[in-house]
């Protein structure tokens, strides 16, 4: 019994001993301190195998073995922090090295006198990548020069091979910085006459905008001022000379007209001094094909002392280095033998009145005209007068039908005044929404002499023979035959004022469209594809006025004599129709510009229009709506 009491008391004393309580409270206190320390900003919680070293170290502080482990734990934390800082330092160093390497690859960063910040380097790198535009394998100019040739020898070889002249033009002001001596053979100007002058003074006025466009957008050296992101001040540059790099975005090739210095005409008669002075001062132009690159040099390297302004400090001098060659148009030569070569052709687009609205660049090699010389002019101004009648008929057909029209061979005047033989395929483009013809597309092919003699099966000839201009212009009864006026300075062969023909044909077709525009049957078809309609009844008011008043003044349909019943697409196909009494073409209005109509003719024309409205639209009586597909 006594032994049992002693065991119970010992058990109670062991249970009531403070050791476990202190251990529990110490553990809770340690964990609380550890949590507070983590909340205050401890960067990292280092744990191994999900066991907190701090808890174990705080628990066994009094134990020597525990103190040793605590010291080792603190050392590990310190080493981990140092390793983390070393990793961050290595990362920053690597990023800085990449930024420096990127700055060395960008040409604009190399020109800076001071070290740029990272944001400026990245912005310049993005700007440089945009200028490359996907160019691959950029090359340096030094790689293209053989080692055994000097610069002067290479220049002479290039000029001899190109058969032109070398010139350097500043992109900012168009100043001629250098030109080779061979320019005298082409432009008849000496080297000293051109160096230092503005290129724009020797260009045709219509080509100045085109050349300025070619000189602008310098891809090699942007002209804008660079701002430092830290200080906000402009960055000053110290340009270091190096091999300039060429890219596809800096390549230039264009045509322009330049003045040719002709020998002055000596005028001895004082009475004609005012008229001859204009001819003496007038300089002829020749077409120059310029091919080269946009490059940049330091202003000090070019030896220019005038660009010492503060704005120009730190900017490269952008220049156009090009070879200018005289561009002579290609005159087709008769082919010898039966060698088949690809025919020369160009594409042009015309308004409905025949004016050029687009010309392919290939036309320059065939016609010697630049595209801007032809734009806005009528094609009838270049047609030979013997072919105008046939081409006018083709013009009507292409406006009234959707089919392709192939013309016969005709003569087209080129720039030197001679004529070249062409054959064209015309088709009209009709707007699907407005149902109106917007423009005419013409594919013009040069016809060689042997093809013209033997005939070409690929180009079928039209059945209607070409009509000359004289056969289309009515002459007075018993009067003399019309003579074609000649214009001083313009070679013969074309007709003065022929550009009005296309406008008259367009107005004629539009007038027919207006007459037929209110007919319900024409709503689903093309407005220019007009179907035949019987003539108005003589019992109608319009018909009585027509019978009493004669033929109304309505634009002619353009039918040639004897073709009234063969050509479809006109309002009246019967020879006794209203328009059949005036079948000839109205080109004689070119010489008569009065064009005024009398009141009686206006009333007769209005009567015809009203009669057509009554006959086609049913305005003269009640209308039956039972045939409509929708309920009313």
Curated annotation (Swiss-Prot):
Domain annotation PAS: ranges: 150-222, 333-403
Residues bearing the modification N6-acetyllysine: 544
Region Disordered, annotated ranges: 1-39, 465-498, 517-601
Chain positions of site Interaction with E-box DNA: 84, 87-88, 92
Cross-link Glycyl lysine isopeptide (Lys-Gly) (interchain with G-Cter in SUMO) residue location(s): 266
Top-rank taxon, per record: Eukaryota
Motif (Nuclear localization signal): 36-41
Protein species of origin: Mus musculus (Mouse)
PANTHER family, alphabetized: CIRCADIAN PROTEIN CLOCK/ARNT/BMAL/PAS
Gene Ontology BP term (one): autophagy
Numbered residues of crosslink Glycyl lysine isopeptide (Lys-Gly) (interchain with G-Cter in SUMO2 and SUMO3): 259
Disulfide bond positions: none
Motif Nuclear export signal 2, residue range(s) on this chain: 367-375
Phosphoserine PTM positions: 17, 85, 97
Outcome reported for the amino acid change (mutating residue 154 to A): Significant reduction in nucleocytoplasmic shuttling
Protein name: Basic helix-loop-helix ARNT-like protein 1
Free-text disruption phenotype from the record: Mice are characterized by reduced lifespan, and the presence of a number of pathologies characteristic of pre-mature aging and increased oxidative stress. They show impaired functional connectivity, increased oxidative damage and severe astrogliosis in the brain. They also exhibit accelerated thrombosis with elevated levels of thrombogenic factors, including VWF, SERPINE1/PAI1, and fibrinogen. Both male and female mice are infertile and male mice have low testosterone and high luteinizing hormone serum levels and a significant decrease in sperm count.
Region Interaction with CIART, annotated ranges: 514-594
Known tissue expression: Expressed in liver and testis (at protein level). Expressed in the suprachiasmatic nucleus (SCN) in a circadian manner.
Activity modulation comment: The redox state of the cell can modulate the transcriptional activity of the CLOCK-BMAL1 and NPAS2-BMAL1 heterodimers; NADH and NADPH enhance the DNA-binding activity of the heterodimers.
Description of how the protein assembles with itself and partners: Component of the circadian clock oscillator which includes the CRY1/2 proteins, CLOCK or NPAS2, BMAL1 or BMAL2, CSNK1D and/or CSNK1E, TIMELESS and the PER1/2/3 proteins. Forms a heterodimer with CLOCK. The CLOCK-BMAL1 heterodimer is required for E-box-dependent transactivation, for CLOCK nuclear translocation and degradation, and, for phosphorylation of both CLOCK and BMAL1. Part of a nuclear complex which also includes RACK1 and PRKCA; RACK1 and PRKCA are recruited to the complex in a circadian manner. Interacts with NPAS2. Interacts with EZH2. Interacts with SUMO3. Interacts with SIRT1.
């Amino acid at each position: 019994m006594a032994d049992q009491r002693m065991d119970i008391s010992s058990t109670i004393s062991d249970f009531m001993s403070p050791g476990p309580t202190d251990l529990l409270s110490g553990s809770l206190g340690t964990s609380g301190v550890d949590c507070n320390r983590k909340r205050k900003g401890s960067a990292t919680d280092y744990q191994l195998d999900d066991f907190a070293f701090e808890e174990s170290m705080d628990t066994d502080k009094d134990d020597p073995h525990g103190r040793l482990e605590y010291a080792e734990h603190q050392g590990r934390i310190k080493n981990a922090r140092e390793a983390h800082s070393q990793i961050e330092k290595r990362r920053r160093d690597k990023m800085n090295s990449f930024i420096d390497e990127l700055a060395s690859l960008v040409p604009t960063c190399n020109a800076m006198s001071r070290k740029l910040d990272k944001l400026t380097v990245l912005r310049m790198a993005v700007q440089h990548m945009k200028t490359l535009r996907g160019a691959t394998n950029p090359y340096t100019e030094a790689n293209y020069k053989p080692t055994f040739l000097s610069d002067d020898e290479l220049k002479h070889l290039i000029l001899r091979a190109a058969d032109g002249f070398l010139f350097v033009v500043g992109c900012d002001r168009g100043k001629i910085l250098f030109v080779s001596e061979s320019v005298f053979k082409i432009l008849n100007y000496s080297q000293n006459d051109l160096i230092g002058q503005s290129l724009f003074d020797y260009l045709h006025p219509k080509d100045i905008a085109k050349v300025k466009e070619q000189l602008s957008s310098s891809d090699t050296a942007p002209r804008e001022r660079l701002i430092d992101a830290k200080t906000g001040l402009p960055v000053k540059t110290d340009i270091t000379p190096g091999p300039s790099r060429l890219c596809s975005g800096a390549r230039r090739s264009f045509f322009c007209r330049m003045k040719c210095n002709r020998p002055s005409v000596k005028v001895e008669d004082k009475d004609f001094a005012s008229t001859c002075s204009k001819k003496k001062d007038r300089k002829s132009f020749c077409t120059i094909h310029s091919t080269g690159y946009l490059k940049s040099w330091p202003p000090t390297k070019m030896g220019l002392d005038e660009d010492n302004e503060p704005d120009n400090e730190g900017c490269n001098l952008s220049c156009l280095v090009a070879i200018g060659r005289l561009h002579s148009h290609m005159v087709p030569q008769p082919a010898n033998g039966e060698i088949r070569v690809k025919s020369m052709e160009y594409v042009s687009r015309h308004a409905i009145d025949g004016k050029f609205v687009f010309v392919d660049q290939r036309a320059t090699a065939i016609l010697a005209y630049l595209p801007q010389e032809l734009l806005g002019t009528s094609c009838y101004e270049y047609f030979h007068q013997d072919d105008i009648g046939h081409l006018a008929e083709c013009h009507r057909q292409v406006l009234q039908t959707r089919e392709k029209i192939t013309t016969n061979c005709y003569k087209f005047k080129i720039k030197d005044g001679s004529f070249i033989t062409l054959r064209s395929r015309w088709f009209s483009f009709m707007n699907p929404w407005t149902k109106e013809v917007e423009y005419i597309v013409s594919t013009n092919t040069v016809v060689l002499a042997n093809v013209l003699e033997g005939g070409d099966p690929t180009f079928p000839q039209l059945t209607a023979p070409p009509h000359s201009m004289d056969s289309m212009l009515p002459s007075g009864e018993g009067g003399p035959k019309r003579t074609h006026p000649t214009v001083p300075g313009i070679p013969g062969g074309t007709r003065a004022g022929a550009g009005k023909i296309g406008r008259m044909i367009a107005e004629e077709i539009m007038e027919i469209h207006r007459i037929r525009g209110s007919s319900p049957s024409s709503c689903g078809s093309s407005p220019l594809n007009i179907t035949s309609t019987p003539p108005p009844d003589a019992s109608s008011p319009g018909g009585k006025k027509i019978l009493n008043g004669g033929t109304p003044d309505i634009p002619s349909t353009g039918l040639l004599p004897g073709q009234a019943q063969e050509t479809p697409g006109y309002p009246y196909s019967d020879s006794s129709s209203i328009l059949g009494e005036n079948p000839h073409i109205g080109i004689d209005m070119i010489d008569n510009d009065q064009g005024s109509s009398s009141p009686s003719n206006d009333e007769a024309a209005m009567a015809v229009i009203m009669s057509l409205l009554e006959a086609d639209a049913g305005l003269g009586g009640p209308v039956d709506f039972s045939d409509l597909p929708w309920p009313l």
